[in-house]
């Protein structure tokens, strides 16, 4: 069985280096191209997909749709879960990461971005950016709406989905694609690979590059990004540097 994890293509706020979280921004032209390339990579590898799951945010949904059209997967069969949404960045949402580093320091921004259990400053329930003010999130129980999450919080939010999902795909066998976000995918990797709190802080997932994980009897027996190692390291370094002063 193969599990393919794919971070959405470049979004408008990836391009402008802003904390995005639950803000529902669109893909850039490059992001669309990245999604197309990802779909073609799956074709080249002859990986047929049995299920596709994604979040309820447009940048992930549209990436999933682009990929599905390329690999001839029925778009109407794409399943969505809010639990796969990006980490909610609280009051940081909309702020430029480099400018935020100038104000609070690179160390603090790194803690907000990459620590396991330290959340960003939370937004107030009366804040206009609170998720309860957006129609897209109306079906989510208000008690579950985040106001600012650490990666630990994302894992707690994700686990009800994950426990059902891993059971489903194990029973089905075959190959399965999750199109989601940097931190929801990092949460999955922490659970799946049993990474320590420290190990997960150095995991950087580039946009639009499929990560193929081969699983046998609930054990990982192989994994690879569908990109050459040199290009992968360049992209991962770019992500690591996003919170630095420029």
Where are these regions (language model features)?
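Phosphate-coordination/substrate-recognition cap region in phosphate-metabolizing enzymes
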Residues: 39-130, 139, 190-214, 239-245
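Short catalytic helix/loop segments, enriched in acidic residues and glycine
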Residues: 21-38
């Amino acid at each position: 069985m193969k599990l393919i994890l794919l971070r959405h293509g470049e979004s408008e706020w990836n391009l402008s280096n802003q904390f995005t979280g639950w803000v529902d921004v669109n893909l850039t032209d490059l992001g669309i191209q990245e999604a197309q390339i990802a779909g073609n990579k799956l074709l080249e590898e002859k990986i047929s997909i049995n299920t596709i799951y994604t979040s309820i945010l447009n940048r992930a949904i549209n990436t999933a749709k682009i990929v599905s059209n390329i690999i001839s997967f029925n778009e109407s069969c794409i399943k969505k879960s809010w639990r796969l949404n990006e980490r909610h960045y609280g009051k940081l949402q909309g702020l430029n990461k480099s400018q935020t580093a100038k104000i609070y320091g690179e160390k603090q921004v790194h803690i907000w971005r990459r620590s396991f259990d330290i959340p960003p400053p939370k937004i107030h329930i009366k804040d206009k950016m609170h998720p309860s003010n957006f129609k897209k999130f109306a079906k989510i129980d208000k008690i579950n709406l985040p106001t600012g999450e650490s990666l630990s919080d994302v894992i707690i939010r994700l686990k009800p989905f994950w426990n059902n999902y891993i059971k489903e795909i194990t029973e089905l066998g075959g190959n399965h694609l999750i199109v989601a976000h940097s931190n929801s995918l990092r949460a999955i990797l922490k659970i799946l690979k049993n990474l320590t709190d420290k190990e997960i802080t150095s995991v950087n997932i580039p946009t639009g590059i499929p990560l193929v994980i081969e699983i046998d009897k609930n054990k990982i027996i192989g994994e690879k990004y569908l990109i050459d190692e040199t290009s992968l390291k360049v992209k991962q370094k770019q992500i690591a540097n996003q919170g630095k002063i420029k």
